[in-house]
Amino acid sequence: MIVVIAALLPPEVHACSTFLVGKGASVDGSLFVTHSDDGEGDPDARLSFIPAADHAPGAFRDVWPDLEDNPRFVGTARGETYLPGRGVPSDAKGTEPIGKIPQVNHTYAYTEGNYGIMNEKQLSIGESTCSGRFVANAKGSGGEALFCVNELSRIAMERCATARCAIRTMGDLATEHGFYGASGSFEGGSETLLIADTSEGWVMHFVPYPETNSAVWVAKRVPDDEVTVVMNMFTIRSVNLKDPENYMYSDNIIDVAVKHGLWDPSGKDGVFDFTKAYSDGEYAHKYYSGRRAWGAFRLINPGIELDPNYGDLRIDDPYPWSMKPAKPVSASDLFAWHRDWYQDTPFDMSKGVAAGPWGSPDRFNGCDAEVSIPGSFERSIALHRTTYTHVLQTRGWLPDAIGGITWYGPHAAHGTCFVPVPAGIKKLPAALTIGNATLVDRDSQWWAHRYVHNLAQMKYAYAVEDIRAAQAMWENEGAELVAAVDAKFRGGAASPEAVDVALGMFEAHVDKVRAAWWRLGDVIMANYADGFVSKAKTGAPVGYPAWWLEAAGWRQGPEPIPPPKTGGSKIFREGGSLEWGARVRRAGSASLASAFRV
């Protein structure tokens, strides 16, 4: 029997929004996988490039613990980003492995953030933490499990060129050596990965199984002409155990559910439902996952009406697993979807008192009082505390080096600019490898976007238009760069020298965007400092909107100056008259400015 003690559950763990677009659902035959890394506290915002390597027979690979705060790793095993002195004290202690497994002869080059992102073969991964009915702890931390999903994704990057290889490799390691989730509770104790190569895309769910130091897992193929989403909760329902083309799973998937009373094979519970059996539902609050799923599907196909309300997301199954889009999907569509805060719906987060006078969609956590004041804000796909978002694009008709594109957006998606990073990169632009949350760094791409996004809160409804204009300009330039490079390599393989020239063009683009964003911060400061909107923008000052003044208690503020008992005060000015002072008194404090216009 599984017992959940709600009082012990954390209010929120890392929570990520993801999309997967089949090649038949995109504008040009690309597959897309996305991921928003929605961290909090002291995130490690750095990207790292891990080069390809050959390994001696009999070598072993260290297995690293699940560390996501800064620094997530210190050492030489995972690229130059994590060398001591790069964003951490030069005397920082190196990260200690929690185990080892046999190494393979050759490992592929790849980029990573908190998880493996894309390798040189265009294998691509996105992640979304989920709740589960079992909890396991890591080896050395009160448990025996060796693998977190972060490490599994890295090993898949190192060893696999296809999604099926990645699923089988990660699944076998998890069941053989044990799997543990992102938190030591049922809330956030399981995981989902979205995995794509140049041909197909899959969704894979992991559940720890501490009873035998193992895991339960399942994977389902996304139809080529459809789009699926995962928003911090399992989505796979029925599993066809006789359809290896579309399903992969651990051998214990049914036995564990039956043993622990999670599914009755007699027929009482109906068809086996993986989510109903193994999910522990939404975490943080009701609608935390389901509302985002509803919001995403309304973007994918606005013509299909779905109900934003439901009873129990785990039981009710109110939304489709995947959906045909209303129109073919592009990278820019996915940028926009990750910037969604339910605009033009009853849940629009830029509306109402919580949005403030300037319509900010961002909501911060409550203070200590939240433990005694029940309540929640809506959670949208766009989130102010996102560490980074990536939109991964795979294209099998081009050489891997430039066919795979990581559209990388540091910090919150609604404030970032997505820049293209090709799969064949040999060294990351330095600006993407720097990001310490405790120190503003003008060499850091992440800090440029974080800085501007926070400045925009001064007058968000106005400043966001400046940000959108910059996003459109620079993301269009990035798309033009990708198209120009594509044209050079469409015929197939190219010389290493030509590839190096192309990669240098991408690095130069990243640096141009970083410089432009720091300039944008200066523009926003000049336009909206001290509560004003500069005359260069509007030609007139802009004060608080009337609806917000009413909500904020403007009418209950200090009273106007009381009228004199016997006429006005005798106030003289050169060439003036006695009645001027009386005019000021009669006007009242709210009209002083007009009274003093002489």
Locate each region found by the language model.
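Substrate-recognition/cap regions that form aromatic- and gly/pro-loop-enriched pockets
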Residues: 358-494
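Second-shell loop/turn segments in exported
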Residues: 138-142, 151-160
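Short, charged, surface-exposed loops that flank catalytic or proteolytic processing sites
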Residues: 159-167
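A contiguous strand-loop segment
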Residues: 16-148, 169-329
